[in-house]
């Protein structure tokens, strides 16, 4: 929260515009919801973007933007809308206005919380020493850091042969670092797939561990 305050304040002071992508804002399943930078800015220095793709269906391709009226007015004049399905858009509007979307989100939080806990338990049970991971309070993902000497980029081909997949760490770094890291998703997998997948991942990591050199 302190970093959000600092960034919003900096944007206000310097006349900057922050684009805040908060796709998982409604999927926090532990602790209180954090304030957005949009809500913290005193001078309208933040545009807040959200989406229905994480809470209803990715295929809807529907989202929203909140910001200062003058900025939204400019964005509205430049918009194009040639591919939107008006029928599904109307259904999404009905889903939200009737309160069913809020009920649905509440159910999703319970589902994703249970899946997250199961994946965390499987990581604790299966992964070799030296592996660490985050314990998320919302969203879809767990960030894993592999033991020293294991490269997530080099390992991915073997992992896929073992029927498990992930996104290597360098995909999230502008400088290409993070090769010991990877991102796992628990959103679209069953309980059985979580246990089987983490078991396969652990076996893959163990096979990639550096071989210890014998000493006299």
Model-derived segments and spans:
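Conserved core segment of the aminotransferase class I/II
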Residues: 42-110
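Active-site pre-lysine segment of PLP-dependent enzymes
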Residues: 1-17, 24-55
